[in-house]
Structure formats: structure tokens, C-alpha cells
């Protein structure tokens, strides 16, 4: 399994191994450049920072050292990390804009004088072609039969780039149950079910809109969250045509 295939099929194992080969310090530093662990600057009061954990954060807030298992969790966006939907939107927009991190704004309409995009920063990669590699993988999340959101693809339809995800809100810790048994037990209480997420942008190759869908306790990103994102993108494109 390579990186592209891991993104398309959402392979946790690949990212477990990648995280342990990197380090929590490098992962946290790179994620910070996408806007995590800071407010986005949108014109709203009370915006949250989220949590971007590292060794210092865990020692200060949990009172424990950082373990390899924590890095493994961070590698798939689980564990101590928390984000806001707006932070996710800024991060996904950075991929769409090939590294440019844009400050989100609330506006009535767009004009060049007052609402031109404000670039907060730029993520510099050693190989800029990696942005296109990421975009192709996110397109295949939808267009490939192996993609976790392949149910969205319609031949001849507008091309979208996206990624499904789930946010686990209930830890698995029952020693006397298998993982499957514990998940089935968790599902009995709807409020403990995983959140369903989908992030994406389109149309590719000239994206105009980024969408982030979070369905609390929705469980299935591909069948619940992703179709909502597609409807939003379709409606936006139709309104501009």
C-alpha cells in the first residue's frame, strides 16, 4: 500500500506506520502550518483553538509522558487532537490552493477592494508536485471503485476531491469484549456513536468551493456526510452557471 492508495481506501494501518516513522514533533509542527491549534481569524466571536497535542501539551495537561501509541492515534486524527469545522475548511482549502493558507471571511458579496483573499501563510513542500498527488488521491476517493466515497461518482458529472473520516467519541477499553463486540455495545447509545465527516472541494481542476460536513453520531461518512457535500457543491456550481 502506498500513500495514494492509503488515502483512497482510508487505510489506518498505513498511517499508523507513517506516524511512528515520523515523530509527534514533526507531525504537530506540520499540522500547525495548516492552521490547526490556532483560530482561523473568521469574523465571528468565540472561535475555538482546538487541541494539537505534543509531548509538552500532554505532560502539562494530562500529567503523563508521550507514548508511541499517542503518536499512532495522532497519525489518523484520533486521540487527544480536536479541531473545529472551520479549521478543517482552512486546511482543505490549503490543499486546493496548493499551499496557500487563506483567512476565511463572512461577506455578503465579493469585490476586489474589500474582499480579495487574505493569504495568512504558505506551506512550502520540497516537491510541489506533492500537492497534485494529494489532489489526485482525493479525486479517486470519489472516482475509484476502491474509494471510500465512490458512491458519489457519476460519469460526466463535475469532478470533486474529497476525504471521508470518522471522529471516535467513545474510547474502547473493555478487556472482556472484542473490538467488534464493544462497537456493537456502543451503538446501543446513539450519543456514543462516531461522528461522520467529509471534507472536499471542487470543481477540479479549478476549485471554487470548499465544504466540510460533520454529522454528529452519523457513523457513516460515505453514505451520510459525503452526499450532503456533493449536493452543496452542485447547488453552488448551478447558481454560478
Where are these regions (language model features)?
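A generic structural motif
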Residues: 216-219
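Beta-lactam-recognizing serine transpeptidase/beta-lactamase-like catalytic domain environment
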Residues: 1-212
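Short amphipathic alpha-helical face segments that pack within enzyme cores
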Residues: 84-90, 224-231
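Short, gly/Ser/Thr-rich active-site loops of penicillin-recognizing serine hydrolases
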Residues: 115-123, 227-241
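Short acidic, gly/pro-rich beta-turn/loop elements at beta-sheet edges
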Residues: 209, 221-223
Amino acid at each position: 500500500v502506498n500513500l495514494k492508495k492509503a488515502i483512497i481506501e482510508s487505510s489506518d494501518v498505513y498511517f499508523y506506520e507513517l506516524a511512528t516513522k515520523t515523530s509527534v514533533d514533526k507531525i504537530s509542527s506540520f499540522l500547525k502550518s495548516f492552521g490547526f491549534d490556532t483560530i482561523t481569524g473568521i469574523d465571528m466571536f468565540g472561535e475555538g483553538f482546538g487541541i494539537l497535542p505534543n509531548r509538552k501539551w500532554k505532560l502539562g495537561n494530562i500529567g503523563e509522558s508521550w507514548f508511541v501509541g499517542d503518536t499512532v492515534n495522532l497519525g489518523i486524527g484520533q486521540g487527544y487532537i480536536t479541531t473545529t469545522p472551520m479549521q478543517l475548511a482552512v486546511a482543505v482549502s490549503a490543499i486546493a490552493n496548493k499551499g496557500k493558507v487563506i483567512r476565511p471571511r463572512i461577506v455578503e458579496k465579493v469585490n476586489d477592494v474589500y474582499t480579495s483573499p487574505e493569504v495568512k501563510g504558505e506551506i512550502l513542500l520540497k516537491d510541489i508536485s506533492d500537492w497534485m498527488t494529494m489532489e489526485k488521491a482525493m479525486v479517486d476517493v470519489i472516482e475509484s471503485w476502491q474509494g471510500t466515497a465512490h458512491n458519489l461518482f457519476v460519469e460526466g458529472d463535475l469532478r470533486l476531491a474529497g476525504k471521508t473520516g470518522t471522529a471516535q467519541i467513545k474510547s474502547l477499553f473493555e478487556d472482556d469484549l472484542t473490538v467488534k463486540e464493544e462497537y456493537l455495545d456502543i451503538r446501543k447509545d446513539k450519543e456514543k456513536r462516531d461522528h461522520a465527516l467529509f471534507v472536499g472541494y471542487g470543481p477540479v481542476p479549478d476549485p471554487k468551493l470548499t465544504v466540510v460536513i460533520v454529522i454528529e453520531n452519523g457513523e457513516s461518512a460515505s453514505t451520510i456526510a459525503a452526499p450532503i457535500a456533493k449536493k452543496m457543491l452542485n447547488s453552488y456550481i448551478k447558481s454560478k452557471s
